[in-house]
Regions:
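Outer-membrane beta-barrel signature, preferentially recognizing the C-terminal barrel domain
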Residues: 8-61, 66-69, 86-112, 149-155, ...
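Outer-membrane beta-barrel translocator domains and adjoining extracellular loop/strand segments
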Residues: 13-19, 25-30, 64, 72-79, ...
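Short Pro/Gly-enriched beta-strand edge/turn motifs at strand-loop
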Residues: 32, 195-196
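C-terminal beta-signal and adjacent terminal beta-strands/loops
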Residues: 123, 176-191, 215-264
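Gram-negative outer-membrane beta-barrel transporters
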Residues: 65-68, 86-186
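Membrane-embedded beta-strands that build the outer-membrane beta-barrel scaffold
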Residues: 1-4, 45-66, 105-113, 123-131, ...
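Extracytoplasmic gating/loop element in the C-terminal half of outer-membrane beta-barrel translocons
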Residues: 197-202
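Extracellular beta-sheet repeat scaffolds used for adhesion and glycan interaction
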Residues: 82-83
Length: 264
C-alpha cells in the first residue's frame, strides 16, 4: 500500500506567545523563554510505501517513508540579548527552519506462539525497528547551515514479550533510541554555523527503558492493572555537542502504579 498527503500544523500557543517567562538566577543574571509571533505554520508533504503480510497469528511489514517539510519549528537559545530593556543571559525562543527532509525504513514483526502446549500458547513476541535520516536547513547572513532534524533519533527499536490468554494480559517491553538534537544555541560571539562547528548544540543521549505491564480481567466489567515503568532506573542525559560536555542529568527512578477499571 502507498499514500501521499499534505499536512499543516500551526505553532503552539507557547511557541507564538510574545509574553516572556522571566527567571532571575542567583548571580543576578536573567534567563527566560519567549515565543515568536512571526512563526509560520509547519507544512509537510508525506509519502509512505509498505508491504504487509498477515499469517495465522502473525504479522510482518516493511515500509519506506519520506517527508518534505517547510517551516519546521526549532527552539533557539540566544545568549546575551536584550528585550524591553532587560538583558537576558540566556533567552529561549523559537524559529522556523527553511527546508527539512526526513526519510527512513520501518520493520514490524508480530508472532503468537500458539504452537506451544498449554498454558504457554498465550505467549507472543513483537518487534519494531526504525532507521531514519533527517536534516533541516536555515538561511543565515553568511549562507545556509544544515543540522539534524530535531528530536529525531537515527535508530529506534522496540521489543515486547508477552502473554495474553484468558484473564491475563502480561507484557515486558524494551524501547531503545539513539541520540537526537534537542535545541540549537546562538552564542552572541559566534554565528550559528560556528556554534555548529564548535558543538554548541544540545543533544539528548541514547536511552533504553524497560517496562512491565500486567492486567487481570476479573469479569466483563472489572479489571485490575499493575505497571512498573523504567525498571532499570535509566536516567536522561543531555550534552553539548559531545557526551563529555554535560548540559543536564535527570534521574526519574522507577515508578509503580496499580489501578482498578470498571466499565458500566
Amino acid at each position: 500500500r502507498g499514500a501521499i498527503w499534505r499536512a499543516l500544523s500551526r505553532p503552539g500557543f507557547g511557541q507564538a506567545n510574545l509574553i516572556a517567562d522571566i527567571r532571575e538566577r542567583d548571580d543576578g543574571n536573567y534567563r527566560g523563554e519567549m515565543g515568536n509571533p512571526d512563526l509560520d505554520p509547519y507544512e509537510a508533504t508525506n509519502f509512505d510505501l509498505s508491504i504487509e503480510y498477515y499469517g495465522d497469528g502473525s504479522f510482518a511489514s516493511f515500509g519506506y517513508f519520506k517527508k518534505d517539510i517547510e517551516n519546521a519549528i526549532y527552539p533557539l537559545a540566544v545568549a546575551n540579548t536584550t528585550v524591553n530593556g532587560l538583558l537576558f543571559d540566556e533567552l529561549l525562543t523559537f524559529v522556523n527552519t527553511d527546508d527539512s527532509d526526513v526519510d527512513g525504513f520501518e520493520l514490524n514483526i508480530f508472532q503468537e506462539l500458539n504452537m506451544l502446549p498449554e498454558p504457554f500458547d498465550g505467549l507472543f513476541v513483537s518487534m519494531n525497528f526504525t532507521t531514519t535520516d533527517g536534516t533541516s536547513s536555515l538561511d543565515v547572513d553568511n549562507g545556509t547551515v544544515t543540522f539534524p532534524f530535531r528530536k529525531l533519533s537515527e535508530d529506534v527499536s522496540n521489543i515486547s514479550i508477552g502473554y495474553d490468554k484468558n484473564k491475563f494480559d502480561i507484557r515486558l517491553s524494551s524501547v531503545s533510541r539513539s541520540p537526537y538534537l534537542d535545541y540549537l544555541a546562538d552564542d552572541d560571539s559566534e554565528t550559528i554555523q560556528e556554534d555548529l562547528d564548535n558543538n554548541n548544540i544540545r543533544y539528548t543521549d541514547d536511552h533504553t527503558q524497560i517496562d512491565f505491564n500486567l492486567k487481570y480481567k476479573i469479569n466483563d466489567n472489572l479489571s485490575l492493572k499493575f505497571d512498573i515503568n523504567n525498571i532499570t532506573d535509566e536516567p536522561e542525559f543531555y550534552y553539548w555537542g559531545t557526551p563529555n560536555r554535560l548540559s543536564q542529568y535527570d534521574e526519574y527512578g522507577t515508578t509503580y502504579s496499580i489501578g482498578i477499571r470498571y466499565n458500566l
